[in-house]
């Protein structure tokens, strides 16, 4: 009796095991998630007057024919190609250049090259913010010239006649080893501090004051409306 019961229980257990679905295999593991890859790039050029920024910008545009170059200096070129700097319009010129860069980013242009002196991290912050908003990778570039911090040679080479004394003071204020993080979190000094620094510089009539503020959308009378890059490539419509 007991043997018959055990035999029946064994057959029942075997039937139950046979009716149970086989265990599911563990889910297949796909490849590890890829790090974000930027498809668009913003080059922020930095350097003292005469260090070779414009030459570097042209070389980048040669390497990347779709590149657009934006320089605050463009604001002060007249239609006949002459350069006429007005220090009272400099902050407006920076704001104008930032608008052009912003429009190009919204249109997905890549790469975009900003050809300014960019002495301080905070001066590049508007462009870094734009890059973050429009998914651009920021690449900082300086000219690789042997004279890029040689004040006497810079005074001789720069095309706007910036004197040696002014370049020396710019060199002393130049921030080295900037990063995207430091630029993004940089604080703009107060207007009083910026004016104090401006008044301490010798007057040269050259356009090398990298300041940024929000100003009305207007252009200087007599300045060209075709906003092409007067020292190199062309980008109509910006």
From Swiss-Prot:
InterPro entries: NEDD4-bd_p2, P-loop_NTPase. Induction: Up-regulated by USF1 in 3T3-L1 cells. Up-regulated by FOXO1 in 3T3-L1 cells. SUPFAM superfamilies: P-loop containing nucleoside triphosphate hydrolases. Residues 192-212 have a biased composition (Polar residues). Gene3D superfamilies: P-loop containing nucleotide triphosphate hydrolases. Might play a role in adipocyte differentiation and triglyceride accumulation. Interacts with dynactin subunit proteins, including DCTN4, DCTN5 and DCTN5. This is NEDD4-binding protein 2-like 1.
């Amino acid at each position: 009796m007991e043997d018959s019961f055990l035999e029946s229980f064994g057959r029942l257990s075997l039937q139950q095991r046979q009716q149970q679905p086989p265990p599911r295999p563990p889910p297949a593991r796909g490849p590890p998630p890829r790090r974000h890859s930027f498809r668009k790039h913003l080059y922020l050029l930095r350097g003292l007057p005469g260090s070779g920024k414009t030459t570097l910008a042209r070389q980048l545009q040669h390497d990347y024919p779709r590149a657009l170059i934006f320089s605050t200096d463009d604001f002060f070129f007249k239609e006949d190609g002459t350069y006429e700097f007005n220090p009272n319009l400099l902050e407006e010129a920076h704001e104008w250049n930032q608008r052009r860069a912003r429009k190009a980013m919204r249109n997905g242009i890549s790469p975009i090259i900003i050809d300014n002196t960019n002495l301080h991290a905070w001066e590049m912050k508007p462009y870094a913010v734009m890059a973050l908003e429009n998914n651009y990778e920021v690449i900082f570039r300086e000219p690789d010239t042997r004279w890029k911090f040689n004040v006497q040679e810079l005074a001789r080479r720069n095309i706007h006649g910036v004197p040696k004394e002014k370049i020396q003071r710019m060199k002393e204020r130049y921030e080295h080893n900037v990063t995207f993080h430091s630029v993004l979190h940089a604080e703009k000094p107060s207007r009083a501090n910026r004016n104090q620094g401006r008044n301490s510089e010798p007057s040269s009539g050259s356009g090398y004051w990298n300041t940024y503020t929000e100003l009305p959308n207007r252009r200087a009378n007599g300045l060209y409306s075709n906003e092409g890059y007067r020292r190199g490539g062309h980008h109509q419509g910006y």
